[in-house]
């Protein structure tokens, strides 16, 4: 199941760092990852998001609602703006805000199937067969979707 969240990508090459991209997710407290280049930063951000969402789901934690990307600002959402001990220095021309997508199912723990017997209305069974649905996958996706969008 694909999930998207906005992320802030700050670029700082002032100290010659091997990982000039610093990435944070404003909807998750203490979120941070980094990348060597834009592609690596995007990959690392997706991986961080997948691991974090899987942890939230598996531990029954409430999943935050994604912020609207249109309401975010690199300046206003700077995670260190109120930290007197740290000043985030970045190049505004190479920094950006982007949506990050992840398939949460790839990060969830045990994929071992558990047999369930259920009853559904005849019309749903008929329609499901007409659509060629995999009923187990449909139920699995619906459960994950309910948790993520609760």
Q: What label would you give each PLM region?
A:
Residues 1-19, 24, 106-108:
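N-terminal segment of the canonical double-stranded RNA-binding domain
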Residues 2-6, 50-119, 123-129, 137, ...:
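Short, charged, surface-exposed hinge/linker loops at domain edges
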Residues 29-40, 117:
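A short, exposed loop/beta-hairpin motif centered on an aromatic-Gly-Thr core
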Residues 39-51:
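A short, charged, amphipathic alpha-helix used as a generic interaction element across diverse proteins
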């Amino acid at each position: 199941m694909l999930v998207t969240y906005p992320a802030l990508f700050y670029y700082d090459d002032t100290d010659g760092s091997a990982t000039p991209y610093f990435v944070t997710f404003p909807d998750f407290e203490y979120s941070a990852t980094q990348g060597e280049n834009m592609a690596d930063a995007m990959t690392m951000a997706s991986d961080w998001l997948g691991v974090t969402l899987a942890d939230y789901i598996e531990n029954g934690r409430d999943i935050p609602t994604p912020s609207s990307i249109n309401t975010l600002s690199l300046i206003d959402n700077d995670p260190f703006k109120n930290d007197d001990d740290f000043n985030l220095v970045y190049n505004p021309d190479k920094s950006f805000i982007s949506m990050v997508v992840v398939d949460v199912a790839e990060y969830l723990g045990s994929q071992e199937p558990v047999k369930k017997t259920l009853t559904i209305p005849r019309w749903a069974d008929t329609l499901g067969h007409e659509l060629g649905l995999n009923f187990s996958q449909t139920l699995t996706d619906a459960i994950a979707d309910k948790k993520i969008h609760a």
